[in-house]
Amino acid sequence: MGSAGPVPSRPASGDQERNVRLGLRANLGQFSILVLLNAFVGAMVGLERTVLPLVGTQQFGLASTTAVLSFIASFGLSKALINLAAGAVADRVGRRRVLMVGWLLGIPVPVLILVAPSWGWVVAANVLLGANQALCWSMTVNMKIDMVGPARRGLALGLNESAGYAAVGLATLAAAAAAAAYGLRSGPFGLGIGIPIVGLALTVLLVRDTSGHVAAETEQLGGPQSPPPPRSGLGNILAFVSWRDRDLFACSQAGLVNNLNDGMAWGLLPIFLSRAGLTLGAIALITAAYPLSWGVLQLGTGSLSDRLGRKPLIVAGMALQGVALLAMVKVQGEGLWLATAIALGLGTALVYPTLLAAVSDLAHPSWRASAVGVYRMWRDLGYVVGALAAGLIADVAGIPAAITAVALVTLASALLTLLRLRETLPTHSGSASSASF
């Protein structure tokens, strides 16, 4: 599967190296802190998901859907490019340092949106938000992967993504309530000023680096899991993950399409529901139900992939996303739209942690963070593609046409994944036996 690594992590030293154990139970304290931190990371995005498209249309008077969705494109492009570098940098300098930088970049975001005199400021703030999400979310993912080892990788990623996206949903509801009480910007983003500050403080005071865990897993593997990428360096890993390896290619395209439809949902659903005559409270409930169900259900789907395998969940989840989006434009009424949002969340819950686990299965520990960074780059470029394509289609043919087009692309991706991806779950006789729960 994976290979001997071109980008070694910093070695652990002294007592840390001797005391390191892989497994969820052995690292429960640090793991729990990182789960909490990822909830703070998710809350940063949740502040925007209902209110920011409405800020664009109602406060800044943007008539073009493409212009409204430009904040998602800037977020996605920043997040994608920094994801690519974040993994490689983390393999060299350690995860904790990168996590701290991510929180520092998040501190100006709510302030810039609060005081923005033009939409350009909001777009610029989302460049910083993309960097914050890339660095912080990537590092919480990689540190959990490092700690638990292969045997509970799906469970670990399910817990991580569950915390993050449940927080997205809860923050979406809180932001809508604050917007109704104090204004579209003053309420949500005044509330959000403290989030990155608390996240940074918790990281500095409580988080330890996981270099020793990477070294321990590499030692337990006793060598490469599969033939190495032919040359060392980030450029080679980029090519290997993007197209040279058929399984990693399948994961990368599925990740891109997943976030393509998420970017569309983030930008278009609030406007679609607003034009249908729903109140801000009803819009918030439906738009929050999607990430909230996505987050909560990942508690089970990540662990399920450890037992059933990665491929069935990924293919089924992509197909369910496509069907849910098609249904969304066909039904009418708050209750039915809520049901389709929950179905979309279930589909995403099946896909999201499982794709990360599959990429982690395929990558050797010594270059795993770089491989995950490349995958996350492609996944988050989906925000750019989704925002721009959906915005252009909506401007030309209407929002229902844009949602339908994204649904069809998602179904095509499910078929491609079915045909290209092989099962990646390690066997109990291989690396999966090296860690204990």
State each model region's role:
Residues 76-84, 169, 291-299, 383-384:
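Residue-level signature of mid-helix packing/kink "hotspots" within the transmembrane helices
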Residues 25-76, 247-250, 254, 258-276:
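Helix-loop boundary and gating motifs at the non-cytosolic
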Residues 97-111, 312-327:
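Structural signature of the two symmetry-related core transmembrane helices
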Residues 194-219, 413-422:
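C-terminal membrane-cytosol helix-exit motif in multi-pass small-molecule transporters
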Residues 56, 89-90, 177-182, 273-274, ...:
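Interfacial helix-cap and linker-helix signal at transmembrane-aqueous boundaries
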Residues 125-166, 357-358:
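Cytoplasmic helix-loop-helix junction between adjacent transmembrane helices
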Residues 82-94, 297-309, 394:
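Helix-to-loop junctions at the C-terminal end of transmembrane segments
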Residues 3-28, 209-251, 434-437:
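Juxtamembrane intracellular "pre-TM" segments in multi-pass secondary transporters
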